[in-house]
């Protein structure tokens, strides 16, 4: 094992809705309660991280890690439009202070998929007003907490909506062919987006969803952040990021600002070159004009995607698959970093990389291979400044519920007892104090 240089972030990541619990004012909480929800189960108290963050941060620090990426929940800070909750600001102030007390660098994400329910009722992530609402929220958070932070991610996986639009279109086309084809297609389609989605269940529930969503959000097709996005909505997200960056720099000019992107290692088989090139343009290249002023880019990668002469291909026959049906392919991270660095000349931080598996020996192997790739990139002069493993603990994987084991720490669903896995110590061993 080769340790990273001093100052390199070796950390773990979480998202508020997936770990905190009782995020009752959010759009996701509302969707989880629908009679015909696409969620396998509701988030409930999640991992109770809201009340147990001190224990979780201590476990992270005791293992040798030196950084923690977490998200600040907009729906807690602004549960009603224009009404901010100072008690929730104080909660996150305590989280940041706890990190620093344990020698942990706090890296805050201001939007990790979930939004306040009221925002979605006002048009959500296809409405121009959302840009100003987001800027106002970001300004409030930075006025209160900005002096205590050095790194801020504005938006997590800003490209997720376009990825979902492409995958949903492909899934619907395959599902129309036959029930048998739909079953197998559902597996491969879900494996090509880096978030837990139940596409088959979503299609089955469509006839009920419109009325139920209208009753909750005032619209039959709520534009939550993780939903199919139009090109106009894609640009709106970029404007929201730019507005947030401007607000952060005006209040705390020394804070380093960036966003994160979900990036696959897109590999072309003979005849698939045009498909792979088009996918990379949509997934990454067209965002370059909007992130050129950022201090860093958050790279989030879990696997590769193959393309042939007819388009996207399934994982190779006999390939090891994770619980998410992703191909076990840790070398994807190095490939993505190198491809990104060819066009983006700022600092890079791996803000997510991980594996869903009940076999922690495979997680250890994944970490070791992925970090070897990161070290190869650094040796070649690529400015990679940190690595955050997804995730600190087993948690709520969105529509898939609690069945996915992404964590470095196991969480007993009955007692909430934490049990560090060997992979946590493995990751900590790479950090230089």
Go through the PLM ranges and name each one.
Residues 1-37, 81-82, 89-363, 372-433:
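Active-site region of glycoside hydrolase catalytic domains
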């Amino acid at each position: 094992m080769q340790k990273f240089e001093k100052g390199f972030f070796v950390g773990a990541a979480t998202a508020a809705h997936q770990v905190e619990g009782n995020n009752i004012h959010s759009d996701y909480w509302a969707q989880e309660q629908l009679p015909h929800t696409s969620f396998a189960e509701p988030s409930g108290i999640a991992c109770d991280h809201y009340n147990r963050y001190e224990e979780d941060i201590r476990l992270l620090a005791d293992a040798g890690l030196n950084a923690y990426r977490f998200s600040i929940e907009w729906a807690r800070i602004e549960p009603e439009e224009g009404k901010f909750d100072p008690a929730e600001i104080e909660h996150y102030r305590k989280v940041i202070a706890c990190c620093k007390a344990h020698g942990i660098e706090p890296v805050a994400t201001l939007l990790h998929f979930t939004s306040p329910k009221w925002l979605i009722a006002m048009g959500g992530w296809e409405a121009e007003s959302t840009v100003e609402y987001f800027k106002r929220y970001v300004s409030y958070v930075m006025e209160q907490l900005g002096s205590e932070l050095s790194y801020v991610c504005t938006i997590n996986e800003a490209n997720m909506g376009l990825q979902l639009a492409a995958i949903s279109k492909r899934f619907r086309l395959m599902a129309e062919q036959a029930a048998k084809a739909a079953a197998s297609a559902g597996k491969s389609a879900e494996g090509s987006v880096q978030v837990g989605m139940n596409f088959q269940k979503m299609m089955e529930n469509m006839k009920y969803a419109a009325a139920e969503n209208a009753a909750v959000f005032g619209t039959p097709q709520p534009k939550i952040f993780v939903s199919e996005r139009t090109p106009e909505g894609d640009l709106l997200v970029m404007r929201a990021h730019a507005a947030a960056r401007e607000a952060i720099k005006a209040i705390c000019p020394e804070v380093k600002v960036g966003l994160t992107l979900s990036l696959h290692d897109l590999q072309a088989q003979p005849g698939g070159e045009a498909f792979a090139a088009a996918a990379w343009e949509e997934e990454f290249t067209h965002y370059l004009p909007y992130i050129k002023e950022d201090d860093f880019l958050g790279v989030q990668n879990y696997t590769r995607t193959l393309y042939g002469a007819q388009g996207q291909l399934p994982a190779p026959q006999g390939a090891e698959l994770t619980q998410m049906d992703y191909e076990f392919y840790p070398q994807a991270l190095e490939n993505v970093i190198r491809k990104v660095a060819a066009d983006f000349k700022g600092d890079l931080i791996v803000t997510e990389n991980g594996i869903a598996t009940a076999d922690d020996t495979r997680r250890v192997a994944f970490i070791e291979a992925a970090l070897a790739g990161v070290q190869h990139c650094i040796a070649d002069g690529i400015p990679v400044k940190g690595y955050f493993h997804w995730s600190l603990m087993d948690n709520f994987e969105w529509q898939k519920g609690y069945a996915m084991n992404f964590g470095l720490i196991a969480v007993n669903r009955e007692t909430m007892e934490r049990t560090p896995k060997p992979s946590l110590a493995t990751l900590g061993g790479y950090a230089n104090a």
